[in-house]
Amino acid sequence: MELNQPPLPTEIDDDAYHKPSFNDLGLKESVLKSVYEAGFTSPSPIQEKAIPAVLQGRDVIAQAQTGTGKTAAFALPIINNLKNNHTIEALVITPTRELAMQISDEIFKLGKHTRTKTVCVYGGQSVKKQCEFIKKNPQVMIATPGRLLDHLKNERIHKFVPKVVVLDESDEMLDMGFLDDIEEIFDYLPSEAQILLFSATMPEPIKRLADKILENPIKIHIAPSNITNTDITQRFYVINEHERAEAIMRLLDTQAPKKSIVFTRTKKEADELHQFLASKNYKSTALHGDMDQRDRRASIMAFKKNDADVLVATDVASRGLDISGVSHVFNYHLPLNTESYIHRIGRTGRAGKKGMAITLVTPLEYKELLRMQKEIDSEIELFEIPTINENQIIKTLHDAKVSEGIISLYEQLTEIFEPSQLVLKLLSLQFETSKIGLNQQEIDAIQNPKEKTPKPSHKKTPQHERARSFKKGQHRDRHPKTNHHSKKPKRR
């Protein structure tokens, strides 16, 4: 491999060096042409640090959050160094089929002018069809662990000596129970392969895996504080548990997002919320792990093509999705941890565009949100759920259907009230019952628990959102199996 970059240090933090352009990174003209045609202007921090290291043939361990441009960080140097020798030269292992397809699309796009051929291997697709694709001599294979291991055990992949192996979203593979599969897969791989490990977090099992499979790696760390950038406005709303679905509907009405993702904790919850929104005539679709492959792909395509503008999804199913134009992210519940929160809100505010991240919390989740806010070192603003405004009431009245029972009730009420008086009373009642979430006095009581809790206010709240800012807190050795390759020595 030709080395056209100066020697690199063994550790690179996100404050090192000035920011170069893609032209400074050592990429070929044909690759640069695809980069600029794809709309890239300058490298992200992870791309700036990783691309030269990969081009030099060094093993890399990189810690960076989802949404930082990791795919291009390993894809561009891989594409740059392909030899087109009719073998699988690079292997990318990733936790989910959606992410595998996303990476395959990205490599195809970035390899446009080098005619890069890829194959995507994942569960839920015909084994026979995958074998047919593999026989067409792709240069890059993108695979999920389970299906890849199945192909290797059954000796369905020939000419399999990848020079570069990428582990993407390594911590997610750990969470999904794939670590044993990963270690077994490495028994089939050439010991001299260049290994690139990418992970949002570095739990101990991932560190131990890195010690086993990486040789004198370049270490790259992009601080999480770079993720919660100023392009993403972060808000939260305090609600009662039973108000979640109504709160999402109200916020969709008042925020009017162009395209939004609503994250739920469970598959059942995703289905229920999607069905609720669809019943209210929202263009909604769902995405979760219990859906079959055809339905999952249909949901993603509907969202990409704007046939649906609300995607209700679980964390795992949406991992790695890179869909442009997402203006809003909603957390139906407070995420279970900071990593999940950062991953979720990273779906918006991309490529220099503005985004909005909104989280619904109950009074019981309030303290956990404050803890999370300190960890991400970013301000999250508190807002009240807006009340229904005049335009919404007019639209509701316009769309309402009048039944015979309502006509009968109207006749009874007009015997008691004048028609004009009746309308005023019904409108007043509508405004009173339209309130969702805690009002300002109730929220103040949560913020200052030592003070006497005021009685809930029944006065009409203003018909606009009132912001209240929160202050931030003070605050390889490998043992190769015999496949169709000869035995390989341990990597030291």
UniProtKB/Swiss-Prot annotation:
A motif (DEAD box) lies at residues 168-171. Residues 445-492 are annotated as: Disordered. The keyword rRNA-binding does not apply. It catalyses: ATP + H2O = ADP + phosphate + H(+). Pfam families: DEAD, Helicase_C. Residues 469-492 have a biased composition (Basic residues). InterPro entries: DEAD/DEAH_box_helicase_dom, DEAD_box_RNA_helicase, Helicase_ATP-bd, Helicase_C-like, P-loop_NTPase, RNA_helicase_DEAD_Q_motif. It is found in: Cytoplasm. Residues 231-393 form the Helicase C-terminal domain. A motif (Q motif) lies at residues 20-48. GO terms for molecular function: ATP binding; ATP hydrolysis activity; RNA binding; RNA helicase activity. The keyword Transmembrane does not apply. GO terms for cellular component: cytosol. PROSITE patterns: HELICASE_ATP_BIND_1 (PS51192), HELICASE_CTER (PS51194), Q_MOTIF (PS51195). Homodimer. Interacts with RNase J (rnj), might be a member of a minimal RNA degradosome complex. DEAD-box RNA helicase probably involved in RNA degradation. Unwinds dsRNA in both 5'- and 3'-directions. Background RNA-dependent ATPase activity is stimulated about 5-fold by RNaseJ (rnj). Stimulates the dsRNase activity of RNase J. This is DEAD-box ATP-dependent RNA helicase RhpA. The lineage of its organism: Bacteria, Pseudomonadati, Campylobacterota, Epsilonproteobacteria, Campylobacterales. The gene is rhpA.
